Amino acid sequence: MFTKKSAGPILLGLLLTFATGAGAQEGGKSGRLTIEQLIEIKHPSDAVWSPDGKHVVFTWDRAGVANLYVANADGHGQPVELTSFAEGPVEEAFWGRDLQTVYFAHEGHLWRATIGGVGAKAAWTATTSSRESDFVLSPDGTRVAFVRSRASDEDAARKSTLIVRTLGDGSETVAAQDNVSIRRPIWSPDGASLAYAVGSRTINHDETPAYSGKKIIYRTWEYVPGQIFAVKIAGGKPVAIGSPVEYGGLAWVDATHLVYDGESKDFKKYSIYVANTAAGKPREIHSITEEQFWSIPDWGEAGAQPWPSPDGKWIAFLSDQDGWDHLYVMPSGGGEAVQITKGHFEAWRPTWSHDSTRIAFDANEPDRPGDRHIGIANLGGNPAHATVTYVTAGNGTNIEPHWSADDKYLVYQHTDTRNSADFFTIEAKGSAKPTRLSDSMPAGIDKSQFVEPQFVRFPGADGKPVPGWLFVPKNLDRTKKNPAIIWIHGDGVNQNYDGWHVQRNYAVYYSFHQYLLQQGYVVFAPDYRGSIGYGRDWRNGVYMDVGGKDAKDAWMSANYLKTLPYVDSDRIGVWGLSYGGFFTLIAMTDQPNLFRAGVDVAGVVDYVMYYSDPYHGGWTASRIGTPEQNPQVYANASPISHIDRLERPLLVLHGTSDVNVPYLESVWLIDEALKKGKGELLSYMMYPGEFHYFTRAHILLDAWHRVDDFFAFHLQGRIKDAH
C-alpha cells in the first residue's frame, strides 16, 4: 500500500501493485470521460475498394479484437459487420469477382464473407496440421496464391509451399517449395508469374523462469532479406534474383522485370535495382549516399519503396536528398529522377492511379508539422511538368490514400482533435467535399470535453528549438500551481500529431491523456530529435548519440513547463512507451530529482542487450554502430547502469510476449534495482501474453487505472476515491 516513505515494494507475478483495485469504474459526472469509455474507441485500418467503387471493406479493431466491416462508398447508412470473431486478426482482405464476396485471412486460413449474408466461413476445407498465409489475388481475380506450411511453430520455418488455387473449382498447383519459409508472393501484371522471398527463420527470445509449472517462451519470425525468386506458374524452375544488398520493397515493373530497393551494410547507401526475371541479374538504376545513415522509415510506414506505375513506364520513390522526404519519379529503365514535391515538409505513402497519370500521397505542412493532407501529383505524361493539387484542407491528419478502380475517388484515414481515426472518401480533385464512412468514437463520449493541443517550441540540449505539444485542461485555475505530466512517444522515428495519433498503438495513449487532462494535469508531448515530420537533419540527430541529446530534449520539457506560471515545478511526472520508456529511465536516473514520479512502459534498459537480439541489431547498428565500435555510446545508452541513482518512485509495466523490447529487459531492471537497494521505489506489473503495444481491453483497463492511481498519489497526493 502507499506510504509517505515509498511507492510500495515491488510486486511480481499477478499481484496488484496498489492496495486499491486497478479495474474499478471511474467518472459518473455528466460529460466526464472515463477510462472504460476511451477503451471502447475503435481503430479502422486496411481499406479496400470494391472493383465497382460502390463499397469499401475495412478492418475495425476494438481493444485488440478485429473484425471486417463494409461501408457504402457514398457514406449512406452505417458500416455493416461481416465477421464477429472474438479474437485473432483479420488480414489481407480482397474482393471476389462477383462484387459480393470478400475474402480474408484469419488464424492461418482463408475465409470469406458475403455482403448481406450471415456470418463468415472458411473459403475451403483445410487441415489443422497446416497453416496458410500471404494470400494474394491474381490480376484477373480467378486465382489466389498463398503459402502453406506446417501449423506448429517448431516446423513452420522448415518447409513451405507456394500454392496457386483456382477459386472456381478449387484446383491447386504447386508453384514452388523450399525447406525454409516462403514469404510475400506477388503476381506479375499478366498473371503468368510469381515473385517471392525465401529465408525467414525463428528467433528464440529469452525464456522466463517457470511460473506455476509452465514456461513462457518468446519467439518471433525474423525476416532474413536478400533472397528473391521468380517462377512461372505454368511450370519451370524458380529463378534466383541476385541482390547485392539486403532488399526491402519488391514489385513487378512489367511481366518480366522486378524492382526492389535496399541499403548497404553500413546503412549509408540506398539503392534501387531492376532485375530481369529470366536472367536474375539486377541492375542499379538509382542510388543515394548519406553522410550519416538512410533514415526514411521503411516501406511499411512511409511507403519508402520503389513503386512502378501500372503501365510499367515510371518508378516513384521517396528521397530525402534535399533534406526533406519528397516524391521523385524516374523512368523504369533508368535515367534522371525528377523531384515532384518540394519544400520544408515530408511527403509519404505514394500510390499510382490505375491509368498511370497521377500519384496520390500525404504530406504535412511547413508551419503545421502535426497536420497531413492528401495531395495528387498530375504527371501529364512528363514528370518534369508535374503539377500538385491538394484535395484535403484544414486541421487534422489525413493519410494513406487509395484510388477507386475508376480513379475518380480516394479513400483515406482522417484524425483530428475531436475525432480518432476514421475512413473518408473524396473526389480526386480540388475543392471536393469529403464523405465520412465510419465513426469510431462511442456515442456516449462528449467530444466537447476534448482538449486541443498547442504547438510550441522550447530550447533543447544544445539550444536548438525542440517542437512539442502542450495540452492545458479546460477551466484550469491558472492562478494556482498545477501538476503536469510529460509523455515521451516511442519508436524514436515517430511523432505527435495535431489530434489523435494515426497509429492505433499510440492513439490509445492520446485517448488516455484526454482523461488525464480532466483529472487536472497539464500534459506535454515533445517531438525530440529523431522524430519524423521535421526533416532529415532532425530525424538523424540521434546519429552516434542515442540516449544523448535526444533524451535530453525529452526531459528538458520539464524546464519548459517550469516557465509556465500555472505549473508546479515540484509536481511534474514523466512517462513513455518503448523508446519513450527508455528516455523515462534515463530521465529518472540522470536527473533523479527533476521528476516527482515516472512510468516506464516496456522501455529498453540497455542497448548492448537490445543490439544482441537479432530482431533489433540492424536498427541499432544503423544509428550507433556496434558495441565493439562505439563502447562509450552504448554505455551512455544504458540506464540500467545508473539505476543506483534512482531517487523517485518508478512504475514499470511490460507484457510477457513483447518481441519489440523483450520482457527480460524489465526483469533485469527489477533485479538490478533490488541489488542496489532501490526496491522500495519500484512498482511493477507484468501482463501475461501481452505484446509490446497494449491491445486487449483487460490489459488497457488495468494499465490505465494503474497509471492513473500512480500519478494521482505522487503528483496530487491522493488515492482515487473510486478505488
Regions found by a protein language model. Give the residues of each.
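Bacterial N-terminal signal peptides that target proteins for export
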Residues: 1-10
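Bacterial N-terminal signal peptides
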Residues: 9-19
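A short helix->beta-strand "capping" segment at the edge of beta-propeller domains
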Residues: 27-44, 79
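Beta-strand-rich domains and repeat architectures in extracellular enzymes and scaffolds
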Residues: 36-66
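Blade-terminus and WD-like Trp-Asp/Gly-His loop motifs, strongest in beta-propeller folds
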Residues: 47-55, 93-100, 135-143, 185-194, ...
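A flexible loop/linker signature enriched in serine peptidases of the S9 family
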Residues: 59-69, 84-90, 102-120, 125-133, ...
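Short loop/turn segments that connect beta-strands within beta-propeller blades
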Residues: 72-76, 114-118, 166-170, 232-236, ...
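Serine-hydrolase catalytic core recognition
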Residues: 251, 261-263, 390, 397-723
